[in-house]
């Protein structure tokens, strides 16, 4: 079993809002991994005095502990408990009902001698490499599948870059984030109930050779710059390591016209070879 990971801020002048960790028991018969991508809020008040890096460190640490030690709890239950624990840590000082309260996308996986379990929430990704080398992406596509009116606003921002257009798009997206009627998409913030909306699953341990967890700053290699498919991305990381993928993304970002939004995003890659 081998773990290899890298995480890098998009801007060296800003704190990294991604999180990555893994735990392997002394027995060597299982493990768990967690990757989070903290959501950078727009400029202005977000109701929290701590900030996104604090939040992802708290949430990620709690989630890894629970996933690694509470085999009696499903991963969705682990996420719900981790969200509740993190919320309790700043409930008395911060406005957890603020729509921009710190939040994050989530990938968590856990394995033992019998099963491999996974959970994905929002637009970070988990790639599962089967015993025969086939690669299957586990994705939560709800953020990518926004309503037509919101997609139209997004396209307008990409065309114009105008501040007013961007503000309108941000407001529309915020209205869909963790929408109670299920019409939008979900991120882990202060409501433990969000865990029920995650993409979850499991498969026999014998059917899985490796796992690759990535934030969207790393999946740009496939999803933004179209440098290869998911199988090609996994092959690159297998052969050259997580750092090579991040370096390729940074090169592509520099060579292409600036993206609307962030030129460089925090990027995290965690490879877990189970055999």
Where are these regions (language model features)?
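PP2C/PPM-type serine/threonine phosphatase catalytic domain
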Residues: 1-275
């Amino acid at each position: 079993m081998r773990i290899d990971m890298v995480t890098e801020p998009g801007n060296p002048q800003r704190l990294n809002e991604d999180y990555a960790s893994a735990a392997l028991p002394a027995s060597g018969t299982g493990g768990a991994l967690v990757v989070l991508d903290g959501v950078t809020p727009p400029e202005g008040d977000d109701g929290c005095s701590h900030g996104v890096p604090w939040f992802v460190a708290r949430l990620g640490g709690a989630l890894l502990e629970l996933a690694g030690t509470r085999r009696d709890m499903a991963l969705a239950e682990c996420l719900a408990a981790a969200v509740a624990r993190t919320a309790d840590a700043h409930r008395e000082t911060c406005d957890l009902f603020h729509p921009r309260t710190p939040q994050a996308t989530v990938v968590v996986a856990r394995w033992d001698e019998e099963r491999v379990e996974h959970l994905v929430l929002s637009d970070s990704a988990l790639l599962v490499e089967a015993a025969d080398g086939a690669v299957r992406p586990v994705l939560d596509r709800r953020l990518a599948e926004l309503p037509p009116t919101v997609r139209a606003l997004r396209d307008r921002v990409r065309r114009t870059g105008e501040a007013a257009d961007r503000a309108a798009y941000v407001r529309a997206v915020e209205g869909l984030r963790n929408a109670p009627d299920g019409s939008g998409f979900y991120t882990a913030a202060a409501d433990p109930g969000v865990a029920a909306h995650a993409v979850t699953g499991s498969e026999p341990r014998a059917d899985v050779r490796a796992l690759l967890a990535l934030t969207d700053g790393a999946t740009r290699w496939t999803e933004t710059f179209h440098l290869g498919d998911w199988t090609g991305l996994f092959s690159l990381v297998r052969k050259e390591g997580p750092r090579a993928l991040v370096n390729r993304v940074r090169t592509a970002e520099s060579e292409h016209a600036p993206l609307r939004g962030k030129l460089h995003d925090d990027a995290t890659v965690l490879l877990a070879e189970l055999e």
